Amino acid sequence: MKYTSPSISDKPLVLYHAVSSYQLLEVILHRMTYHSRERTVLILPDFITQKYPQYKKLVTRRLFNEVYLFPYLHILHREEQQIFEDVKLCYEQIIPHPITDFSEIYVAGAHFYFSLYLIQNRMPFHFFEDAAGMLSRSNELYETLAASFPTHARIARKHRLFNGESPYICSVICLKKAQTIDVSGERYVDFSVEEVLQNLPERKRNHLIHFFLKHRLWTKAEAILLTQHFANLNMMSEEE
């Protein structure tokens, strides 16, 4: 399933992937900050429509140029090679752009199966931590997923998709001050959802937040509370 805005085909293509509410806010703000002039494509999980049936507004409000729903609910947790084949088929049936057409690829929720398509095609990508400080607690993320989806968790850990150490990950985007591990290396990029949201002009901030909430945010403090609320969603179930 897809939703797109009128074509602006002359501009470079940038791809984003997100799964949770926090990650969606994260990639929206990152796009606003670093890729506002490029043509951006967003991949969301098909189950996000349960939480955000208004997902098409991401395009009509010009937050992204194209949005596609990846059919995670239809990919069975079976043998790894079969999962690779299923993911390849899903991507090539749903996304009308060869993966090599993208100048940059950003993945939040990298432990989800879409990342396997990037690995299969040897495509470098940028990794977002799952929520503020979660990079330092990647084993918790693995254990939570393994409790319900052991095959999924095993494959993601094998390819180092919880801790951002896959050789195909060219940078790790995280909130540095929230980490308890060493993130001083060049591959670690500091990004604060809270600060970017606070610093948006009020009109733009409320325009964005109206996608998530029905009422207006009157103060920056309310915006901070919202991001903290999203940060607490880092242990969401796969269906959420």
Located regions from the model:
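N-terminal beta-strand-loop-alpha-helix module at the start
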Residues: 2-41, 210-240
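Generic low-complexity segments that are intrinsically disordered, proline-rich and/or Lys/Arg-biased
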Residues: 7, 13, 97-99, 168
